[in-house]
């Protein structure tokens, strides 16, 4: 992919939509279709209980067997669904629809459900993969067509699992990677509100406030060396989603009281990525993209006269520009980064 962001913001974001330009969206889709059905390499993360469990990834993951791992394949499908909804007349749109018709069948959904129903898979992909699956379900619902209904047995199962899990999750997980609970709740809340699942939505709001409502004076000791999420900023984004506007502004002022001065500095400066062939270090490109997403979401809730707002928007653009040229630099990033670029460009409340 050519370094589009170096050509200027007009080539990145549509002036009419809170979205990437059609050209960039098509590039994202081409990139994703190139790996979403690529079976290898593939990272297995499930628990094996016997010889019968050692099977090809495609056997146990009949839909989500590509893109290096289960969760990346899930959010690759989310990207395609979002692009299709944004620009249904793109030249690549028929390829996306054909892929969805082949991927989303009742039999394949049943195969995905079967894995989750195994006793050893109780915590499989919790919470990151769960959240992305729910995000995909929400997008398919908005898109229309049969695919969301076909996937409903799996999305319903995962929503129920999350409802059962949250009441006993006494503490948040504040990591910068897959186990971060704030990120998972941001995505799951979108599903709950789209599906009108009030039980899940209320649980998410309740848990977010219990975990983070009293947080203040965040020190933001980040990034860590393999972060793709900012624990500080994704927490703030979650609270932006669950609190009333005035309440969020008060909470944010206490959470990052020096933000108007650009501190903590680490939150405003893009992370350096020293080796994009190293799967863990390559996470830092994702960190820069997810920070752009978070800063844009936070800025949208701040008063126009608040000096933090401009700093947040500038930081978002700097983080986006640092990562966009590198989405296909190596397969360690190529199999997932475009989804986070799309979040940064169009997922602002």
Task: Cite the ranges covered by each PLM segment.
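Low-complexity, Ser/Thr/Pro/Gly-enriched N-terminal "stalk/linker" regions
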Residues: 5, 11-65
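Well-ordered alpha-helical scaffold segments within catalytic/enzyme domains
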Residues: 12-20, 77-90, 131-146, 184-196, ...
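Solvent-exposed loop and edge beta-strand segments that line ligand/cofactor-binding
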Residues: 17-21, 57-74, 114-130, 168-181, ...
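Long, well-ordered core segments of solenoidal/helical folds
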Residues: 28-41, 53, 96-114, 153-170, ...
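Extended ligand-binding groove/face enriched in aromatic
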Residues: 74, 83-192
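Carbohydrate-active enzyme catalytic cores, enriched for enzymes
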Residues: 103, 107-117, 230-235, 239-247, ...
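Active-site-proximal alpha-helical scaffolds that flank and shape metal-associated catalytic sites
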Residues: 124-131, 175-186, 190-193, 209-261
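Fungal-biased detection of long, low-complexity, Ser/Thr-
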Residues: 268, 272-349
């Amino acid at each position: 992919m050519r370094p589009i962001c170096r050509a200027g913001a007009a080539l990145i974001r549509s002036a009419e939509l809170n979205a990437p330009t059609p050209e960039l969206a098509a590039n994202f889709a081409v990139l994703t279709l190139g790996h979403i059905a690529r079976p290898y390499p593939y990272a297995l993360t499930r628990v094996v209980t016997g010889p019968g469990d050692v099977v090809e990834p495609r056997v146990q993951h009949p839909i989500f067997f590509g893109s290096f791992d289960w969760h990346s394949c899930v959010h690759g499908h989310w990207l395609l669904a979002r692009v299709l909804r944004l620009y249904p007349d793109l030249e690549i749109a028929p390829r996306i629809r054909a892929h969805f018709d082949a991927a989303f069948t009742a039999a394949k959904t049943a195969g995905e459900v079967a894995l989750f129903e195994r006793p050893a898979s109780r915590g499989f992909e919790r919470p990151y993969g769960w959240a992305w699956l729910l995000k995909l379900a929400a997008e398919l619902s908005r898109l229309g067509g049969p695919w969301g209904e076909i996937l409903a047995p799996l999305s319903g199962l995962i929503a129920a699992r999350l409802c059962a899990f949250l009441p006993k999750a006494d503490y948040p997980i504040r990591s910068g990677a897959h186990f971060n609970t704030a990120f998972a709740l941001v995505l799951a809340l979108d599903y709950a509100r789209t599906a009108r699942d009030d039980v899940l939505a209320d649980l998410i709001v309740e848990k977010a406030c219990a975990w983070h409502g009293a947080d203040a004076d965040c020190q933001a000791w980040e990034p860590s060396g393999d972060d793709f999420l900012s624990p500080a900023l994704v927490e703030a984004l979650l609270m932006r989603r669950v609190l009333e506007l005035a309440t969020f502004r008060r909470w944010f002022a206490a959470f990052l009281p020096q933000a108007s001065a650009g501190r903590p500095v680490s939150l405003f400066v893009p992370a350096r990525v020293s080796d994009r062939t190293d799967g863990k270090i390559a996470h830092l490109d994702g960190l820069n993209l997810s920070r752009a997403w978070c800063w844009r979401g936070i800025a949208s809730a701040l008063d126009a006269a608040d000096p933090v707002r401009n700093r947040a928007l500038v930081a978002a653009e700097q983080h986006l520009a640092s990562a966009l040229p590198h989405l296909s630099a190596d397969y360690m990033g190529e199999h997932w980064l475009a989804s986070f670029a799309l979040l940064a460009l169009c997922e602002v409340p």
